[in-house]
């Protein structure tokens, strides 16, 4: 009864109006699962391949009919007949079927859509929530959210180089209260920006995209918003950032070009000094992709300087890849990994990366992409793995709110068992 009888994929749209893939899996018993695949704007050089059609006459070349056909004609033939509960075997079969190191033949988007849909169908078959199916009955930790309330870089058309300025409500007793605190700071920020005559339009991830005078002004205005909302910066709410430095690194010159803000060129050493200065002035607890994805020597220096007191997250640096992560762990680079399911392409490999990080004392931050859908699987993954942190955008746009609302449901379902760890989520820091 748990045997897969049908797999079907179709082309749908993501939050940016670009095509993405949706996959449905059916079993003999009538159990059903659906998975939708996100897409990034700033992508790491070593990410698994997102297969696009390249036909400029259709969706400007961004169609995914090739990926859809690969699911319907190749993957389906190989996977139909499997027990839907055998996630690892199904994921491995798809990896072997693709046969490339980066899933470039079938497309990571095709493979991931099936992987998610299979997990959801298995949970439906067993009549348990997805987070319980994926994590067993020790799933209890609600993640501390990184809420991206100011967007810059590749996520907005403004004068800010850094891609994300985030708040983390570490002083909240529950996820529900953390979400409320974040929403109140978000609305306070809207009021402040409006009062200054600045735009309150939002970027890809639902954060505001104002034309501020400098990158540092992003932190200043958020501190003001935290206080306006009635909270204490550094105690109730701390700051996090995603520099996405690979996006403004000039490979030919070997320097970081802060062109949007007009702050000029900086060497690796100057960037590290800049981060040191920011951390000394503002309650910044997490910096993601502070340096270019290939600047491993620089990352090692950054880790030596700030690694005891600041979470240094590798996104483009590690691309949710256990081989890259293992190398980083061995070399003492960063102390955290960003987990994006579509960077690697299967749930099995995603869980392996999270487990490897935890074993090494690195944190794992489960993350959305800038091009999202209403699929809320990452919320279940965050709880299933007790990861402790999630990054899923701002307090606007339904594609972001869908993840927060799912976490509210999960916390409600868990009842007294649910834990919200706040500052304790940063077990990788010696000096919090």
From Swiss-Prot:
<dbReference type="GO" id="GO:0000287">
    <property type="term" value="F:magnesium ion binding"/>
</dbReference>
<dbReference type="InterPro" id="IPR020810">
    <property type="entry name" value="Enolase_C"/>
</dbReference>
<keyword id="KW-0964">Secreted</keyword>
<dbReference type="InterPro" id="IPR036849">
    <property type="entry name" value="Enolase-like_C_sf"/>
</dbReference>
<dbReference type="Pfam" id="PF00113">
    <property type="entry name" value="Enolase_C"/>
</dbReference>
<dbReference type="InterPro" id="IPR020809">
    <property type="entry name" value="Enolase_CS"/>
</dbReference>
<protein>
    <recommendedName>
        <fullName>Enolase</fullName>
        <ecNumber>4.2.1.11</ecNumber>
    </recommendedName>
</protein>
<dbReference type="GO" id="GO:0006096">
    <property type="term" value="P:glycolytic process"/>
</dbReference>
<feature type="binding site">
    <location>
        <position position="391"/>
    </location>
    <ligand>
        <name>(2R)-2-phosphoglycerate</name>
    </ligand>
</feature>
<feature type="binding site">
    <location>
        <position position="288"/>
    </location>
    <ligand>
        <name>Mg(2+)</name>
    </ligand>
</feature>
<keyword id="KW-0324">Glycolysis</keyword>
<feature type="binding site">
    <location>
        <position position="242"/>
    </location>
    <ligand>
        <name>Mg(2+)</name>
    </ligand>
</feature>
<feature type="active site" description="Proton donor">
    <location>
        <position position="205"/>
    </location>
</feature>
<feature type="binding site">
    <location>
        <position position="163"/>
    </location>
    <ligand>
        <name>(2R)-2-phosphoglycerate</name>
    </ligand>
</feature>
<feature type="binding site">
    <location>
        <position position="315"/>
    </location>
    <ligand>
        <name>Mg(2+)</name>
    </ligand>
</feature>
<dbReference type="GO" id="GO:0000015">
    <property type="term" value="C:phosphopyruvate hydratase complex"/>
</dbReference>
<dbReference type="Pfam" id="PF03952">
    <property type="entry name" value="Enolase_N"/>
</dbReference>
<comment type="similarity">
    <text>Belongs to the enolase family.</text>
</comment>
<dbReference type="GO" id="GO:0004634">
    <property type="term" value="F:phosphopyruvate hydratase activity"/>
</dbReference>
<comment type="pathway">
    <text>Carbohydrate degradation; glycolysis; pyruvate from D-glyceraldehyde 3-phosphate: step 4/5.</text>
</comment>
<dbReference type="GO" id="GO:0005576">
    <property type="term" value="C:extracellular region"/>
</dbReference>
<feature type="active site" description="Proton acceptor">
    <location>
        <position position="340"/>
    </location>
</feature>
<feature type="binding site">
    <location>
        <position position="369"/>
    </location>
    <ligand>
        <name>(2R)-2-phosphoglycerate</name>
    </ligand>
</feature>
<dbReference type="GO" id="GO:0009986">
    <property type="term" value="C:cell surface"/>
</dbReference>
<feature type="binding site">
    <location>
        <position position="340"/>
    </location>
    <ligand>
        <name>(2R)-2-phosphoglycerate</name>
    </ligand>
</feature>
<keyword id="KW-0479">Metal-binding</keyword>
<dbReference type="InterPro" id="IPR029017">
    <property type="entry name" value="Enolase-like_N"/>
</dbReference>
<keyword id="KW-0456">Lyase</keyword>
<comment type="function">
    <text>Catalyzes the reversible conversion of 2-phosphoglycerate (2-PG) into phosphoenolpyruvate (PEP). It is essential for the degradation of carbohydrates via glycolysis.</text>
</comment>
<dbReference type="InterPro" id="IPR000941">
    <property type="entry name" value="Enolase"/>
</dbReference>
<feature type="binding site">
    <location>
        <position position="370"/>
    </location>
    <ligand>
        <name>(2R)-2-phosphoglycerate</name>
    </ligand>
</feature>
<comment type="function">
    <text>'Moonlights' as a plasminogen receptor and often plasmin activator. Plasminogen binding increases bacterial adherence to host cells; plasmin activity leads to degradation of host extracellular matrix proteins, facilitating bacterial dissemination and disease spread.</text>
</comment>
<keyword id="KW-0460">Magnesium</keyword>
<dbReference type="InterPro" id="IPR020811">
    <property type="entry name" value="Enolase_N"/>
</dbReference>
<keyword id="KW-0963">Cytoplasm</keyword>
């Amino acid at each position: 009864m748990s045997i897969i009888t049908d797999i079907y994929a179709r082309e749908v749209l993501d939050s940016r109006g670009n095509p993405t893939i949706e996959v449905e899996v059916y079993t003999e018993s009538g159990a059903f699962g659906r998975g939708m695949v996100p897409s990034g704007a700033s992508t790491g050089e070593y990410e698994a391949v997102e297969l696009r059609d390249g036909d400029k006459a259709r969706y400007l070349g961004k169609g995914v009919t090739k990926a859809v056909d690969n699911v319907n004609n190749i993957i389906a033939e190989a996977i139909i007949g499997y027990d839907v509960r055998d996630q690892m075997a199904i994921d491995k079969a798809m990896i072997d079927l693709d046969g490339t190191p980066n899933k470039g033949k079938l497309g990571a988007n095709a493979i991931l859509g099936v992987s998610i849909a299979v997990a959801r169908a298995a949970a439906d078959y067993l009549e348990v929530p997805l987070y319980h199916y994926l994590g067993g009955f020790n799933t209890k930790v609600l993640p501390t959210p990184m809420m991206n309330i100011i967007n810059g870089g590749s996520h907005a058309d403004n004068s800010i180089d850094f891609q994300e300025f985030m708040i983390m409500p570490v002083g909240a007793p529950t996820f529900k209260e953390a979400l409320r605190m974040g929403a109140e700071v978000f609305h306070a920020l809207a009021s402040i920006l409006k009062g200054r005559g600045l735009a309150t339009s939002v970027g890809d991830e639902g954060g505001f995209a104002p034309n501020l005078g400098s990158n540092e002004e992003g932190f200043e205005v958020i501190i003001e918003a935290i206080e306006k909302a009635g909270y204490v910066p550094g105690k109730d709410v701390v700051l996090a950032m995603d520099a996405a430095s690979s996006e403004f690194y000039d490979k030919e010159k070997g320097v970081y070009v802060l062109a949007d803000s007009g702050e000029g060129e900086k060497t690796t050493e100057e960037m590290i000094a800049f981060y040191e200065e920011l951390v000394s002035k503002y309650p910044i607890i997490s910096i993601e992709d502070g340096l270019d994805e290939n600047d491993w020597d620089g990352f090692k220096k950054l880790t030596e300087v700030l690694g005891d007191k600041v979470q240094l997250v590798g996104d483009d640096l590690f691309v949710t890849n256990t081989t890259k992560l293992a190398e980083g762990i061995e070399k003492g680079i960063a102390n955290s990994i960003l987990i994006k399911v579509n960077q690697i392409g299967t749930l099995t490999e995603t869980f392996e990366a999270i487990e490897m990080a935890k074993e090494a004392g690195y944190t794992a931050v489960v993350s959305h992409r800038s091009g999202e859908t209403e699929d809320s699987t990452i919320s279940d993954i965050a709880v299933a793995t007790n990861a402790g942190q999630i990054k899923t955008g701002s307090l606007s746009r339904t594609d972001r709110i869908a993840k927060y609302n799912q976490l509210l449901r999960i916390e409600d379902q868990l009842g007294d068992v649910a834990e919200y760890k706040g500052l304790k989520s940063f077990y990788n820091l010696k000096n919090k």
